[in-house]
Amino acid sequence: MRISISSVVSSTTSRFVHRNLQGKGNPRIAPSSIDLCGMCYWGRAFSSGSGDYREILRNGLHSMKLDDAIGLFGGMVKSRPLPSIFEFNKLLSAIAKMKKFDLVISLGEKMQRLGISHNLYTYNILINCFCRRSQISLALALLGKMMKLGYEPSIVTLSSLLNGYCHGKRISDAVALVDQMVEMGYRPDTITFTTLIHGLFLHNKASEAVALVDRMVQRGCQPNLVTYGVVVNGLCKRGDIDLAFNLLNKMEAAKIEANVVIYSTVIDSLCKYRHEDDALNLFTEMENKGVRPNVITYSSLISCLCNYERWSDASRLLSDMIERKINPNVVTFNALIDAFVKEGKLVEAEKLYDEMIKRSIDPDIFTYSSLINGFCMHDRLDEAKHMFELMISKDCFPNVVTYNTLINGFCKAKRIDEGVELFREMSQRGLVGNTVTYTTLIHGFFQARDCDNAQMVFKQMVSDGVHPNIMTYNTLLDGLCKNGKLEKAMVVFEYLQRSKMEPTIYTYNIMIEGMCKAGKVEDGWDLFCSLSLKGVKPDVIIYNTMISGFCRKGLKEEADALFRKMREDGPLPDSGT
């Protein structure tokens, strides 16, 4: 005989259930936001007979739209005699599969008001909906009501609660529930264990999840393909690839054949963790076992191979993919286009873009951004701007990265006005420039020898709450020094030193070079000598800068002495020395 279900819930939850059982009716729920007015029309449509709704329930639920389902319910409640609870359950189940959980709960409440009594299956549907909405307390209250009416919870009921616990950050309750289910005489099935395993991974309890697979087998519950898929996916997300491989071996020993989803998951993980050869070997193994790769398998591998500049392997896979009539998707094309752009092979990238269009594959923001970057890299700014405008015309709106790419292109080409115009347009679209945006504009104004506007952009950046990084400061200091504004650069440098941000070796070189070129070699030498006190080891560039400063000032002995020190300290002189 099974022990009481009350042991399943904590004392706090039990009190909640008890309070909700004091009155009649369902637990209190928020009103549904779904408009049920459509029931009126359907009520009239079904009032003539009962055969119509039965025909739809029998044949038409799999393709039914939400409005039709609402209308069908309206017709059913007005039909006389009333449909059976089994027929209502069939409709509620169909709506639940549409993930309209709040609507199912509202319809269940309406049934109660109309005097249509729920059965165990109805309660299971409603409890599942509460759990899916993360309203576990209401699910438990309904469980209590159901039991008071004499319904014993089934494994389905408890599995729904388990799922609710797992997704409601109550994993300890989920584990306790499974243990108590066993004590109560229930036999957890594969779905129950798989749900708990998924929950354990959600809460970063990978070792417990893997151990549970062995526990399943010990209890005579054989893990299925879905179970193994959940475990493999969880392990791969954590980077535990060796454990994932061990699991593949366990599957093989249990005569459970891994499917394309499981293989693709492991291959993708191998790619992300830079094991491209292992990924290719596993790809070959899956083919040898008769598992046909899909577009996701190919896309992961192609993207990985492109990242490691293995063009011939990537091209071979693309050809193989097309030959097998597996259509590349936007992810596949994006990986290749981005790789070709970074390699400087813009012609090949454009050909792939044309191929996408021929195949009626819509480019996305990554496609356009990669091509815009390619055009900018090759100083084809008008084509980059055209691609940018085409992107917007296709309702694919640029993000901050896209704008930054184009602004940088115009700034490098000394077309700063167009870069500023893009910055304004970006703000009008509600996008906030980031550190890269402002730093790019500062650099662009300095290139145009417009120090005032460069400093204005820096002030606006701070005013807008965008934090400068060391790259921003280096750009500002370099621009001021090269444009003869050493005094202003010194103010910025002193502020930087007082801040929590650490200057880089490049920062010090900028200042030493600026001081030397401004004739303040002694100040440059003082800063150079302070580096060792700051724990900064001078590199060959700083030595060259300081030696050049001494030479420019005619201090040959000091230059020779520093050259000897350079050779003693380790940085090898280069052609600049």
UniProtKB/Swiss-Prot annotation:
It comes from Arabidopsis thaliana. InterPro entries: Pentatricopeptide_rpt, TPR-like_helical_dom_sf. PPR repeats lie at residues 49-83, 84-118, 119-153, 154-188, 189-223, 224-258, 259-293, 294-328, 329-363, 364-398, 399-433, 434-468, 469-503, 504-538, 539-573. This is Pentatricopeptide repeat-containing protein At1g63400. Belongs to the PPR family. P subfamily. Keywords: Repeat. It holds the Pfam family PPR_2. It comes from the Eukaryota.
